């Protein structure tokens, strides 16, 4: 089982490590220099916010019971995705691994910080997209790969 899923585990580990390192750097910078709000170019800012919801701040709760329930639900979904990754192959396995790696990064923050640090702020002509993090990038890419794989299955 390990040999068959080796690449999947490598992708999970890469996603998790890149996410953790980026968040540690951003949080340390913010703790050292105060609020982080830095423009890197006309389209990209670094702006640390703490997200108590899920992707893009959705389902943010003040009630701790709902927050804990949501965290356990996310852990359950990660376990289901891991099971699906074991049963998949090829590009689909990479899609599941990418989603799992990003999800593990975000759920780790939920457990240790009770929120997820988001800091990548894309904008164009004053329109700002939702602030996100490296884990969200891996989750999004993984979902895109899985959607692509589903379309390829339907063509056959």
Task: Give residue spans per PLM region.
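Alpha-helical transmembrane bundles and membrane-interface segments of multipass inner-membrane proteins
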Residues: 1-156
């Amino acid at each position: 089982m390990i040999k068959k899923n080796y690449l999947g585990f490598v992708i999970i580990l890469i996603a998790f490590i890149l996410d953790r390192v980026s968040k540690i750097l951003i949080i340390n910078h913010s703790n050292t220099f105060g609020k982080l709000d830095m423009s890197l170019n006309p389209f990209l800012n670094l702006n640390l916010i703490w997200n108590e919801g899920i992707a893009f701040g959705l389902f943010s709760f003040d009630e701790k019971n709902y927050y804990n329930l949501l965290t356990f639900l996310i852990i359950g979904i990660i376990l289901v995705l891991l099971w699906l990754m074991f049963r998949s192959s090829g590009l689909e396995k990479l899609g599941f691994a990418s989603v799992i790696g990003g999800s593990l990064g975000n759920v780790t923050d939920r457990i240790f910080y009770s929120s997820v640090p988001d800091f990548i702020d894309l904008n164009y002509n004053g329109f700002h997209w939702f602030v996100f993090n490296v884990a969200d990038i891996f989750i999004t890419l993984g979902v895109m790969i899985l959607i692509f794989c589903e379309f390829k299955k339907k063509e056959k």
